[in-house]
Amino acid sequence: MTFASLRRGYQVIRTLLHYGLDDVLPPTLLPGYFKLLRLCLFWVRNRHKDKCGGERLKLAMQELGPVYIKFGQMLSTRRDLLSDEWAQELSMLQDRVPAFDSALAREAIEAELKAPIDSLFDDFDDTPLASASISQVHTATLKSNGQQVVLKVLRPNVEANIKADLELMLQVATWVNRLLGEGNRLRPVEVVEDYQNTILGELNLKLEALNATKLRNNFLDSDALYIPYVYEELCHPRLMVMERIDGIPVSDIEALNAQGTNLKLLAERGVELFFTQVFRDNFFHADMHPGNIFISREHPENPFYIGLDCGIMGSLNEEDKRYLAENFLAFFNRDYHRIAQLYVESGWVSADTDILAFEQAVKLVCEPMFNKPLNEISFGHVLLELFRTARRFDIVVQPQLVLLEKTLLYIEGLGRQLYPQLDLWQTAKPFLERWMAEQVGPKAIFKKVQTNLPFWSDKLPEFPELIYDNLKLGRKLLGSQQQMLDRYLKYQQKAHKSNFLLITSAVLLICGTILFAQTDTLWLASACLGSGALVWGAGWRSRPKNRKF
């Protein structure tokens, strides 16, 4: 490790100790002299004993800076790992940092564009529109078409700083994994690696631009979602240029009510958008917190969402999508045996899992939820509780499913904030049933046949030759297998005969040795020893020489 890494490591440990996070560890894991060591090496006392563990961790991450703040935000969505109290505290972390010098922003933008800002843009505003831990946003006007745009540029040295902190996080996670028995259940290394993949993806603004364009194309004809146009020719790994939008933050309910927005329709459209992204497009926005979502000012009676920040996107494979849809349908049909079967069939839990025990565990979690009205049941919490239950059966929650569960919780929270009476099931059920029918019904089978028709048409002329070759090969294999079986049987016969003779000779030799000690039976001892030697020789000669079949 470099000196800089050691210094940062010391700073991280000192901050964690300052907030007394060593208190949350089991006392048996820390040596008796640990408190003295803490005072001597780090000069800190725990002055936060009056605060709960979750609040202490939140304060520590705020002090450690942007990388740890975003890590805390990610942890707040892992309610399959953390208690509700800890997750709730971490969810209050805010990714807000002071803006960096606009001169540095100009320098970074011009380095990416390889051209002066004034040659491409008018009215570049040196005062940032927004500033976050990874990037900063400035406004300008495109010279080519007069369109108002925003320029999102990475902070100076952000990549090096993030990678250094990630390396340290992985080392700490590895240590925790070894130290704690609980560490195996929490899987700290897996959690940090998941976060690493997420945040490193956010460092590539060119990738974010491609994600935004793909999502925009998926909803070009939609009256429910609008994604701002991205100027891909001006986008680079450290710079993204996109259309500037004017909308109302989704969390500003007062402003939405003031313009007469149809909140019921808006809430229902949010649910439909989620299921459309997941099941129709298999490409969903996985960071749909209120700061990334705005509502159109036009047509408040027919409102649409405006989505920003496509740095984190998710997708599921076809099987996971089907299992997920069946899971939801089975839950609302109260078919807990089917839910347990689906978890095993999907590979989310081990095939040797006790289905009946798992079914009972699922029933204990799900059945109390039906005491609530349907419009109070949360899909996200259903999925979350199923993950928590399955974790007791050694489930490894896939990162994409965690992203989906987090997104579903966001969507539900927003929907019920907009319209508290939102009946999620009433909105989602027709969509899920229609999607399932499309996947397994006659139309789906015909579509799959139609899709694969060119391939099979190309292969059809080869079928007679393939059948003949396979029959010929099968005949050869059958003959060779019969020969191998014959050789194996002969080998076994020889081996049994040899073993029998060798065991018999051993018995004769032992008996001869015992009899030899008695002077009145020397003749019998000699006979046993001689016979034993002869039988041993016969057994040795008859043993099989070749084990190859």
UniProtKB/Swiss-Prot annotation:
Main location: membrane
Active site residues of this protein: D287 (proton acceptor)
One GO cellular component, as annotated: plasma membrane
Pfam families, per the entry: ABC1
Membrane topology (UniProt): Multi-pass membrane protein
Superkingdom classification of source: Bacteria
Keyword Ribonucleoprotein attributed: no
Any GO BP annotation: ubiquinone biosynthetic process
Single GO MF descriptor: protein kinase activity
Keywords from the named record: ATP-binding, Cell inner membrane, Cell membrane, Kinase, Membrane, Nucleotide-binding, Transferase, Transmembrane, Transmembrane helix, Ubiquinone biosynthesis
Subcellular location(s) per record: Cell inner membrane
InterPro entries: ABC1_dom, Kinase-like_dom_sf, UbiB, UbiB_bact, UbiB_kinase
Entry's transmembrane regions: 499-519, 520-540
E.C. designation(s): 2.7.-.-
Sequence positions that bind ATP: L129, A130, S131, A132, S133, I134, S135, Q136, V137, K152
Domain Protein kinase intervals: 123-501
Pathway where this protein functions: Cofactor biosynthesis; ubiquinone biosynthesis [regulation]
Family that this chain belongs to: Belongs to the ABC1 family. UbiB subfamily.
Protein purpose: Is probably a protein kinase regulator of UbiI activity which is involved in aerobic coenzyme Q (ubiquinone) biosynthesis.
Name under which the protein is recorded: Probable protein kinase UbiB
Taxonomic source organism: Shewanella amazonensis (strain ATCC BAA-1098 / SB2B)
Gene (name only): ubiB
